[in-house]
A protein has these predicted regions:
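Short catalytic helix/loop segments, enriched in acidic residues and glycine
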Residues: 55-79
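Active-site rim beta-loop-alpha module in soluble metabolic enzymes
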Residues: 176-239
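Short beta-strand segments
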Residues: 41-42, 92-93, 132-137, 187-188, ...
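Active-site glycine-rich loop that binds ribose-phosphate moieties when present
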Residues: 117-118, 154-180, 189-193
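Extreme N-terminal starter segment of soluble prokaryotic enzymes
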Residues: 35-39
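C-terminal accessory domains and tails appended to enzymatic cores
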Residues: 213, 227-316
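A glycine-rich helix N-cap at a beta->alpha junction
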Residues: 109-125
Length: 316
């Protein structure tokens, strides 16, 4: 109170409270740039028009045709992701020796993983990604009406089960990505894989049909122009689902129980050289691991050992 003028000078306490820390936090967040990272695994058997072995081998008569198609469709997905706000994009070349894509066609913002052998093979380096997309994927071994049906190693593996479920390469890789909290949001490939596995195990993932097979070496595919449009809109839908939080990682339980059926007893004999492998049949073995990534590594090692045995026996 200013007694000289009769004026009340007492400061009134504001009814509004000021949280300085909350204000600072909000101010900082308003300037934070969120970097989104996508991971693309590219196989070849599920690509359109691939119907003969000559499409799939480095010295195959039609190999260059498939390289161009796979690169072209990969670029469609890469560009669609970039337009949707993904600044970091990793492409994993994932067929055979894993040196198939035409590197000179890839934009500067893409990092390419290529070469084999490598950890977790088809999903090397997936950790730290926000989303994963699989292109050119095919059905598992023993699937009817599916071109080049096989599971990872067509020459040695008859069937692979993880925790009692027979898996395709799609499911093997999806479990591995899920272990590091990465959801698969789009799969493009053979119709039979999309129906048998993708729709069943990851119903939230966009499914883009690149081919519909009449058998192991015959299939029908739309024109490239239509496929490019399908992939473009598919990526847009998949990213929208991700941003709306309607996608999720697919995680298998641990410990991981693996059952493996080889195509002959030579391979099962060889696998028993590892102490953690238990023989349960003429062609059958099983093992248990603490993590999905560990299961993948042992499985991959057994496939490589089988390939070595096959080469040795071929020369005898």
């Amino acid at each position: 109170m200013d007694t000289r003028r009769g004026i009340n000078t007492t400061r009134r306490k504001s009814s509004l409270s000021f949280d300085e820390e909350a204000f600072k936090d909000k101010a900082i967040k308003s300037f934070v740039v969120v970097i989104m990272k996508a991971y693309i695994s590219v196989d070849l058997e599920g690509m359109p028009y691939v119907v003969i072995p000559g499409h799939l081998k480095l010295k195959g008569a039609q190999y260059e045709e498939v390289r161009k198609i796979a690169t072209k469709l990969t670029l469609v997905v890469v560009n669609a992701l970039h337009e949707a706000g993904f600044d970091e994009i990793i492409v994993a070349d994932s067929h055979g020796p894993m040196v198939n894509l035409m590197v000179e066609e890839l934009p500067d913002y893409v990092e390419l993983i290529r070469g084999f052998p490598r950890p977790q093979a088809m999903v090397t380096g997936v950790e730290g990604s926000d989303v994963a997309l699989f292109l050119g994927y095919h059905a598992k071994s023993g699937t009817a009406y599916a071109t080049f049906d096989h599971t990872y190693s067509g020459g040695s593996i008859q069937a692979l089960k993880i925790n009692g479920i027979e898996v395709s390469e799609f499911l093997l890789n999806t479990y591995t990505a899920g272990e590091v909290n990465v959801p698969v949001i789009l799969v493009a490939g053979d119709y039979q894989l999309l129906i048998d596995d993708v729709k069943v195990h990851t119903p939230w993932a966009e499914r883009i049909e690149l081919k519909r097979s009449f058998g192991r070496s015959a299939a029908k595919s739309p024109g490239l122009g239509k496929l490019e449009k399908d992939l473009q809109t598919g990526v847009e839908r998949a990213v929208s689902k991700f941003k709306e939080k309607t996608t999720k990682p697919l995680v298998t339980k641990t410990p991981v129980n693996v059952e493996l059926t080889f195509k002959n007893s030579y391979f099962a004999d060889t696998s028993e050289l590892l102490p953690q492998i238990k023989r349960v049949g003429g062609h059958d073995v099983k093992f248990t691991t603490k993590t999905m990534s560990e299961a993948y590594e042992i499985f991959q090692l057994l496939c490589l050992a089988a390939a070595g045995v096959a080469a040795i026996k071929h020369d005898q």
